Amino acid sequence: MKIGYLGPVGSYSYEAAQKYKKEEDELKESKTIEKVISSLENDAIDICIVPLENAIHGAVVDTMDTILENKDINIIDEIVLDVHHMLMSKTKDSTIAKIYSHSQALEQCKTYLNENFADVEKIPVSSTSYAASLAQKESDTACICNEICKDLYGLEIVSDNIQDIKDNKTRFILLSKSKNSRETKKTSIVFSTKDEPGALYKILGMFSIAEINLTKIESRPAKTKLGDYIFFVDLEGDEKNEKIKLTLANIANYCDEFRILGSY
């Protein structure tokens, strides 16, 4: 099986993919989240692993927006990864004039960076491992990445565990063009409400009446007009469960757009 991930080698997505893959599986990297999911759409890979949310900085909007644009993909599993950020450079004693990392990592380490490198340029790039590759090549440069990158890119640790909270975690989802056949514990849906008073309230009330527990609700701009939103919801239970199936069917009647992203 071919598994796609956000590369290059050494990224947190790579780390998550390593935890999931079996010995016979092949990992295939892409430079952006959009390209990872596009590879799945084009059948270049069988599944892909992408970050969805972080304990400090919240949703990974690139993933959410790309899922909205690709209607034929399903969430089939999730991996929660402990994330311990480290500041690295070619040598410990080098002067640091700029720091590369993924935008999420820069935000997750904001307190440390403000206290120690307030005047240093912070440059967001496509992944933490790509940041490590840049720090390997450039002088007066550091990166924020994971411990895997130390040996992969020949870097030295300047400071470790620099994230704002020590119990930092990122949730990754596995995407496939096939649905899950096994029994599952969680279902993700996405919907937009009709333009009428109390539409969202009515939908949330249906979950309450059916005693279905919601574990997450997140909104994204619908990109139609100001004030229009798409809602991502995680709920406990399998979409094949009769109570959940009936509730979701009723909710769909109150939506302009409704889609089950998958059970896992």
Name these PLM-found stretches.
Residues 1-264:
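Domain-level signature for soluble enzymes in the chorismate/prephenate branch of the shikimate pathway
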